[in-house]
């Protein structure tokens, strides 16, 4: 069954996103539902489809299960949905917050201290030179993979490496004296970048990666960087909240 839970007392058909291949073709009614307490969490089956994100929990959780196939991931990102879960003890969980935290590339904020770092030109930058090293460091830097809530496990790494291989995931590498100092990776669809993770092996390297990404996107008509969740660090660099409706308008206009 595709739909497992709906709002308490709901007796009318709910909705899910229907697709052909990886193309969004609209919202259709589905009679497959069962009542729960006071929220909706959908259990995905093997069909490449997602529930209407407006039906999710306040924290953005809309579904569990499914898989990390390229077709499902691309459909997810085209609708503002992304996977996030502890690979050690949880099934795949899918989120779509209604308040979207983004950075518009042309509005990236560079602090005075960070500008001084950049002016010293100690870093050099590449795009997609070593995606495998970047995602592996995002997983293991500072012992992240040892934490109970670690989310970037082998299955996720393999899924995003495949997206990279077929042209939908991008890495930014930051180098210092020929050594990898930091970087980030994410999904690229059209003129939008969906950030997944970043790391630093040297001070300021991940900030430098984000600034380089934003400036590169700004010079190539990039529309937005999806930061997924709000943090004070990203807020200080220009992150801001927009509505899901505005977010989707930007994605669909690309």
Where are the predicted features?
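Short hydrophobic targeting helices and cationic amphipathic motifs
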Residues: 3-5, 13-16, 30-33
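Local alpha-helix boundary/kink/capping signal
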Residues: 16-20, 89
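N-acyltransferase acceptor-side catalytic subdomain
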Residues: 24, 28-254
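Residue-level detector of alpha-helix boundary/anchor positions
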Residues: 2-3, 7-9, 178
């Amino acid at each position: 069954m595709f739909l497992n839970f709906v709002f308490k007392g709901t007796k009318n058909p709910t909705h899910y996103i229907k697709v052909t291949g990886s193309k969004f073709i609209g919202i259709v009614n589905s009679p497959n539902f069962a009542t729960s307490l006071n929220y909706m969490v959908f259990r995905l089956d093997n069909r490449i489809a997602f529930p209407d994100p407006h039906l999710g929990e306040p924290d953005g959780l809309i579904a569990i299960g499914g898989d990390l196939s390229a077709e499902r991931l691309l459909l997810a990102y085209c609708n503002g949905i992304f996977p996030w879960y502890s690979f050690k003890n949880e099934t795949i969980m899918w989120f779509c917050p209604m308040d979207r935290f983004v950075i518009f590339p042309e509005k990236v904020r560079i602090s005075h201290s960070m500008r001084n770092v950049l002016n010293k030109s100690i870093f050099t930058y590449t795009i997609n030179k070593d995606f495998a090293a970047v995602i592996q460091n995002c997983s293991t830097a500072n012992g992240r993979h040892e934490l109970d809530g670690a989310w970037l496990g082998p299955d996720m790494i393999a899924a995003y490496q495949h997206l990279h291989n077929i042209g939908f995931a991008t890495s930014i590498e930051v180098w210092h004296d020929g050594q990898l100092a930091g970087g980030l990776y994410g999904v690229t669809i059209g003129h939008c970048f969906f950030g997944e993770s970043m790391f630093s092996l040297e001070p300021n390297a991940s900030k430098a990666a984000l600034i380089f990404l934003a400036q590169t996107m700004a010079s190539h008509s990039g529309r937005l960087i999806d930061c997924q969740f709000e943090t004070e660090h990203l807020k200080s660099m220009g992150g801001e909240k927009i509505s899901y409706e505005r977010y989707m308008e930007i994605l669909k206009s690309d």
